[in-house]
UniProtKB/Swiss-Prot annotation:
Its main location: cytoplasm. GO terms for molecular function: aspartate 1-decarboxylase activity. It comes from Pseudomonas aeruginosa (strain ATCC 15692 / DSM 22644 / CIP 104116 / JCM 14847 / LMG 12228 / 1C / PRS 101 / PAO1). InterPro entries: Asp_de-COase-like_dom_sf (IPR009010), Asp_decarbox (IPR003190). This is Aspartate 1-decarboxylase. HAMAP family: PanD. Its cofactor is pyruvate. GO terms for cellular component: cytosol.
């Protein structure tokens, strides 16, 4: 059996660019791609915290250290500069891989400053 699991997440990143007339994709600071394990051209899901939009695109590399999140092409209709987004990548894992799987999560502070990283989401309490 295989399961689709969260592979990586950038939590509360701010959109820095929304470029309608650009080949579709989402440009992400190359340092964050490396740290999260998201690969260039990998399918990603983007969840817009500010307007509720959810959409699929693929990641491309932005300049290392740029703090860039650029939503491009038709997806630029779904996010504007300043919107806070969650960017997720998922992968298929075998039963054997599930035993040791831990997602890589990057948590962003205002201004796209990396706050911290984690491999687990805290248990939600009432």
């Amino acid at each position: 059996m295989h399961a689709i699991m969260l592979k990586a997440k950038l939590h509360r990143a701010e959109v820095t660019h929304a470029v309608l007339d650009y080949e579709g994709s989402c440009a992400i600071d190359g340092d964050w791609l490396d740290l999260s394990g998201i690969r260039e051209y990998e399918q990603i899901q983007i969840y817009n915290i500010d307007n509720g939009e959810r959409f699929t695109t693929y990641a491309i590399r932005a300049e290392n250290g740029s703090k860039m999140i650029s939503v491009n092409g038709a997806a630029a209709h779904k996010a504007k500069v300043g919107d806070r987004v969650i960017i997720c990548a998922y992968a298929h894992y075998s039963e054997a891989e599930l035993a040791s799987h831990k997602p890589r999560m990057l948590y962003m502070a205002p201004g796209n400053q990396l706050s911290h990283t984690s491999e687990a989401i805290p248990i939600q309490v009432a």
